[in-house]
Design a protein with these regions (language model features):
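Short amphipathic alpha-helix adjacent to the substrate-entry channel of hydrolases
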Residues: 110-129
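Gly/Ser-rich "nucleophile elbow"/oxyanion-hole loop immediately N-terminal to the catalytic nucleophile
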Residues: 94, 140-183
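The feature captures the conserved acid-bearing segment of alpha/beta-hydrolase catalytic domains
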Residues: 196-281
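Short glycine-enriched nucleophile-adjacent loop
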Residues: 182-193
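Alpha/beta-hydrolase-fold serine-hydrolase catalytic core, especially in secreted/extracellular enzymes
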Residues: 264-265, 273-310
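Short beta-strand element of the alpha/beta-hydrolase
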Residues: 95-104
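N-terminal cap/lid segment of alpha/beta-hydrolase-fold proteins
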Residues: 55-94
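Extracellular Cys-Trp
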Residues: 22, 31-40, 44-47
Length: 310
């Protein structure tokens, strides 16, 4: 399945809210009553409604309510990423398939909260992470972070006291990211070819290597086809006019990643007409529908989901 889609009439939006699981005290939680509530049973701040038909911030529109696991509650703190939070569905179909999410340049773990809530509300374990250095970590380092986070999810399957003990599908892990994180998802695929799927949200990719790339402006950066030569099924969201915003990334955006990946790899590029670099940053409309159906098809073997991708 190798198709290019141009989708019209996107509505761009921004998400402005507190990310409740990051608030560690009841008093902090109560400062955001429109979004958050304190759970007396878990001593944790959580999103109001916790998912299930539009709970949380309104992006988690799936049928399941969800909860979170933070590092203060025993989640492993991996060396290759920072600020991991796991979201998991309540009373979903087990064992749970997992997806790990990482942000773009300058962003932290909380930037991916809306996507994590969305996937958890649809029955997946979703872990959001941030890079150790939001400015200086390379695409490759962020890819290592995605793989390291998978190890943290795996350890929840055997950790005493974890609500996910015995509930994790140990053979089904996918990765996703926005912008620089979207490019890092392909680094992760090169590191671990057993990944089930990739969802790249307005990805960028840079390889700094003077053996492969021409020296321009004091730097040797480019897209090296050999470094996206993997077979992991990939859904790539790209804005038609992204290059107008990111002129320095000519040849290194989603369209370029798609065209340089092997023809044998199952891949789709979803190009937003007249859209820029941020149109897939948050789950909404056609973007979230395609992302969810990509996972349903490649992870849950849902043939009907395949029809929705054509």
């Amino acid at each position: 399945m190798k198709h290019t889609f141009i989708i019209f009439n996107f509505i761009l939006f921004s998400l402005v809210s507190a990310d409740c699981p990051d608030l560690t005290t009841e008093s902090e939680c109560n400062e955001w009553p429109q979004y958050c509530e304190w759970n007396e049973d878990t001593n944790q701040c959580q999103n109001i409604g916790g998912g299930g038909d539009g709970g949380g911030n309104g992006d988690a529109d799936g049928p399941y309510e969800y909860m979170t696991i933070t590092e203060s509650q025993g989640l492993r703190n991996g060396p290759d990423y920072r600020d991991g939070v796991v979201y998991y569905p309540i009373n979903g179909e087990t064992p749970y398939k997992s997806i790990v999410l990482t942000p773009g340049f300058g962003g932290g773990s909380s930037e991916m909260a809306a996507w994590a809530e969305f996937y958890a509300s649809h029955g997946f374990i979703a872990m959001r992470i941030g890079p150790n250095d939001e400015i200086n970590d390379s695409h490759y380092q962020r890819g290592l972070g995605l793989i390291d986070a998978i190890e943290s999810i795996k350890q929840e399957n055997s950790r005493t006291g974890s609500p996910l003990n015995g509930l994790v599908d140990m053979d089904s892990f996918s990765v996703s990211g926005y912008s620089m994180g979207g490019g890092a998802s392909h680094d992760a695929a090169m590191i671990d070819g057993s990944l089930k799927a990739i969802i790249s949200l307005n990805p960028t990719v840079i390889f700094e290597d003077c053996d492969y790339c021409p020296l321009e402006g004091g730097y040797c950066i480019c897209l090296v086809p050999e470094f996206v030569d993997h077979s992991v099924p990939s859904l790539i969201f790209a804005g038609e006019v992204e290059l107008n915003e990111l002129t320095a990334y000519e040849g290194m955006l989603g369209q370029d990643i798609y065209s340089n990946m092997p023809e044998s790899t199952d891949k789709i590029m979803f190009e937003g007409a007249n859209s820029g670099h941020g149109f897939a940053a948050y789950p909404s409309g056609e973007v979230s529908n395609y992302a969810l159906n990509w996972l349903k098809y490649h992870i849950l073997d849902d043939v009907d989901a395949c029809e929705s991708l054509l």
